[in-house]
Regions:
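Short, Lys/Arg-rich, polar N-terminal cytosolic tail immediately upstream
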Residues: 1-4
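A structural signal for multi-pass alpha-helical bundles of membrane permease subunits
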Residues: 6-278
Length: 278
C-alpha cells in the first residue's frame, strides 16, 4: 500500500495542475453568457440563462481585428515556412562556400533578445514608407517573416539532416531539379515537423501585442489591440462591458483551439521526430 502513495501523489498533482489550467477557461465561459447584473452579483456563480448578446456585441467590435490577425498570421507563417524550407534545404543538401559559417551566423540570431531590435525595426519600417507598407499589414508581415527564420531554419535543417542523402543524389541522377527534390521529396517527408514549426510560429504571432501596437495604423489593428482597448473600456465602465470582454476572449481562443484540434497529431509527430533527430 505504501508503494502506491507516490503514484497517488503524482495523480493528485496532475489533477491540481489540470484544474488550474481549466479554471480560467471555465471562468471565461460562464461569465461570457451572463447579464451585467449576474456578473456584478457573483462572477463565480453559474449563469441562470444563456445571454448571447455578449457574443454578438463582442463580434461587432472585433470582427475586423480578427480578419486582420488572420491575414497577418497566414501570410507571415507562409513566408516563414517558404524561406526556411529553402534555406534549410540549401544548408543540408547543397555545397557552397562558407556554408557552416553562415549557419552558425543564423543560429547566433537566436541569442539576440528581440527587444533590442525594436527601435531599429521601427525606424527601418518607417523608412520603407515609399513602398507603401508603413502602417499596414506589410509593415508587420515582413518583420515576422524575418524574425521567424532563425529558429525555423535550425529546426528544419536538423530534421532534413536525417533524410538519406542517397535519396536526394538518386533524384539528381534521374534529372530532378533542386526545386523538384525540395517540393516532391523533402517537404512531404518532413510534413510533421513543418506543421510543428508552423504552429510554433502561429501562436506568438497571433498573441503579439507589442509590434502591432508600434507598426500598425488604426484601420489595420489586430485582435490583441482590440482586446486591450475593450479591456480598458470595461474597467472604465465598471461591469457593463465585462460580459462583452469575456465573450471577446472566448472568440479569440476559438481559432487556435480549432487549429490545435486538427493539427495536434502532426504537431506531436513533429516534436517527437525532431527530438529523435536532435
Amino acid at each position: 500500500m505504501s508503494r502506491k502513495w507516490p503514484e497517488y501523489l503524482r495523480y493528485l498533482i496532475l489533477v491540481i495542475l489540470a484544474l488550474c489550467a481549466i479554471f480560467p477557461i471555465f471562468f471565461l465561459l460562464i461569465n461570457s453568457t451572463k447579464t451585467q447584473l449576474e456578473f456584478s452579483t457573483n462572477p463565480l456563480s453559474l449563469p441562470t440563462g444563456i445571454d448571447w448578446h455578449n457574443y454578438t456585441n463582442a463580434f461587432d467590435i472585433i470582427d475586423r481585428p480578427i480578419l486582420n490577425s488572420v491575414i497577418i498570421v497566414v501570410a507571415s507563417v507562409f513566408g516563414i515556412l517558404a524561406f526556411a524550407c529553402m534555406s534549410a534545404y540549401a544548408f543540408t543538401f547543397m555545397n557552397f562556400p562558407f556554408r557552416r559559417v553562415l549557419f552558425v551566423a543564423v543560429f547566433a540570431l537566436l541569442l539576440i533578445p528581440g527587444v533590442l531590435t525594436l527601435i531599429p525595426l521601427y525606424l527601418q519600417i518607417k523608412r520603407l514608407d515609399a513602398f507603401g507598407i508603413n502602417g499596414n499589414w506589410g509593415g508587420l508581415i515582413l518583420p515576422y517573416i524575418a524574425g521567424g527564420q532563425a529558429f525555423s531554419i535550425f529546426v528544419l535543417r536538423t530534421f532534413f539532416g536525417g533524410i538519406s542523402k542517397d535519396l536526394v543524389d538518386a533524384a539528381r541522377v534521374d534529372g530532378a531539379s533542386e526545386w523538384h527534390i525540395l517540393g516532391k521529396i523533402v517537404v512531404p517527408l518532413s510534413l510533421p515537423v513543418i506543421v510543428s514549426v508552423a504552429v510554433i510560429n502561429i501562436v506568438p504571432i497571433w498573441n503579439d501585442y507589442l509590434l502591432p501596437s508600434l507598426l500598425l495604423a488604426e484601420k489595420y489593428k489586430t485582435l490583441t489591440i482590440a482586446l486591450v482597448s475593450l479591456q480598458g473600456n470595461a474597467q472604465t465602465h465598471s461591469s457593463s462591458q465585462f460580459g462583452i470582454l469575456m465573450a471577446a476572449y472566448v472568440v479569440a481562443c476559438i481559432p487556435l483551439a480549432i487549429l490545435f484540434t486538427f493539427l495536434m497529431r502532426y504537431y506531436v509527430q513533429g516534436l517527437t521526430s525532431g527530438a529523435l533527430k536532435i
